[in-house]
Regions:
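Patatin-like phospholipase
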Residues: 1-60, 68-417
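Catalytic cores of secreted/periplasmic lytic hydrolases that degrade extracellular macromolecules
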Residues: 63
Length: 417
């Protein structure tokens, strides 16, 4: 879906170069994949815009990785190479960084267990507290995250320490803001703004993406920080408050509508099973998506009232897109397919809504490239072709295909009568 908000300008509007900001929401590995595919489509199909020359980048959680890369001069295609492709280069962002067990956190919590057990027994036996109340004290022995996120800081620091890049907010050409949430107050922490810009970009990224339950909170200057999406979905006001002419927002997570498209062709479409058939993970995913998207919708209504002189364009997936909703982002094959899917879907959205988008973008010197939009053979990624004379490669390819087909069957099969 592409949503636009119209700016109301006076005749004295500035004729200087338009101020452009880019706000990227979170969404885990899936969010990063979608945003990369969508950005590549925008870069290919919009003339007059350079996504490495924005005035302000705002990133939350996974969107922070993309925002930081763009601010450091990495093009959308280079980000695709780093996040999506599975080539043995030092530029790759390996998803294995995200699934290392948090042994240090677990060990620290286990050390507390004897004392907590003693405290619980004392409260129950000596103080006469109810057993359930006494056992609540054992909650402090549970780890705050199951995966270690320290590797995120180390690897991003390495990538941004290369020549021509910087891990220091203050040395970037454009403004970069990475938003986390302070755990003890619930306040937003806009790393990169004055007073917050001394923190390394890699550490701010680690904090902004520290989703509670998955990753432990990140300690910065003696305070604990967690995922920035806990406070807001986009934090677009960070850029809007500083004044921009055009704000482009990318939101990768939308609630899924398990119903066919309306229209004459709807009767011939295959029945989409209820999400309840996917069990707890699917129900929780839909719940989480619905909550963050409702916040986003309320936020955009507020933006329209409070920032009438700014054009705002929101780009997000179709809510009936089952491929994105049921994706396995830790599968290399599916990462490539999802990035290509996001690329093609974004191009289709631009074609469908060009009458609505064109005049708004033209006010800022941006034009739709009709040739690129109509090019049916244009792709983000070239198909991977394994050598026919490599038995191991062929076997691995067949295994990937079988597993992907099995997963697709399990997530989309209809309920039994």
């Amino acid at each position: 879906m592409v949503t636009t908000r119209k700016a109301h300008r006076s005749s004295a509007a500035s004729k200087t170069r338009p101020r452009l900001a880019l706000a990227l929401a979170g969404g885990g590995p899936l969010g990063a994949i979608y945003e990369i595919g969508a950005l590549c489509a925008l870069a290919d199909c919009l003339q007059g815009i350079d996504f490495n020359a924005c005035d302000h980048y705002v990133g939350v959680s996974a969107g922070g990785f993309i925002a930081a890369g763009l601010a450091n001069g990495l093009t959308p295609r280079q980000l695709c190479e780093a996040f999506i492709e599975d080539r043995p280069t030092e530029e790759n962002f390996d998803t294995a960084w995200l699934i290392k067990p948090a042994w240090a956190e677990l060990g620290d919590r286990l050390q507390r267990l004897p004392g907590l057990l003693g405290s619980a027994l004392w409260a129950w036996t000596a103080q006469g507290k109810p057993l359930t109340q006494a056992l609540e004290r054992l909650g402090a022995a549970l780890p705050t995250g199951v995966f270690d996120n320290e590797d995120i800081h180390r690897q991003v620091e390495r990538l941004f320490s290369r020549e021509g890049r910087s891990n220091d907010f203050r040395q970037l050409r454009a403004r970069l803001t990475l938003v986390a949430t302070e755990l003890d107050t619930g306040d937003a922490a806009p790393f990169g703004r004055p007073g917050w810009d001394h923190v390394p970009i890699s550490r701010a990224l680690q904090a902004s993406a520290a989703l509670p339950g998955l990753f432990p909170p990140v300690v910065i200057d003696g305070k604990h920080y967690v995922d920035g999406a806990l406070k807001k979905t986009l934090h677009a006001t960070v850029a809007l408050d500083e004044g921009v002419d055009l704000l482009i927002c990318l939101n990768p997570l939308v609630p899924f509508r398990a119903e066919p498209h309306a229209g004459p062709a709807a009767s011939g479409q295959q029945r989409i099973p209820s999400l309840i058939e996917g069990g707890l993970p699917t129900v929780m995913s839909q719940t989480f998506r619905s909550m963050i998207h409702s916040r986003l919708e309320l936020g955009f209504k507020q933006y329209e009232r409070s920032y009438p002189d700014t054009d705002i364009v929101l780009i997000e997936p179709d809510q009936r897109d089952a491929e994105l909703f049921f994706a396995n982002t830790f599968s290399y094959r599916q990462r490539r397919e999802l990035a290509e899917h996001a690329y093609q879907q974004t191009r289709q959205m631009l074609r469908d809504r060009q009458a609505q988008l064109a005049p708004k973008l033209q006010r800022h010197g941006i034009h739709l490239d009709q040739t690129a939009l109509d090019d049916t053979g244009r792709r983000l990624l070239q198909p991977v072709r394994l050598a026919a004379d490599r038995p191991t490669a062929r076997a691995v390819d067949r295994l990937h295909t079988t597993l992907d087909q099995l997963q697709q069957h399990l997530t989309t099969r209809p309920a039994r009568a």
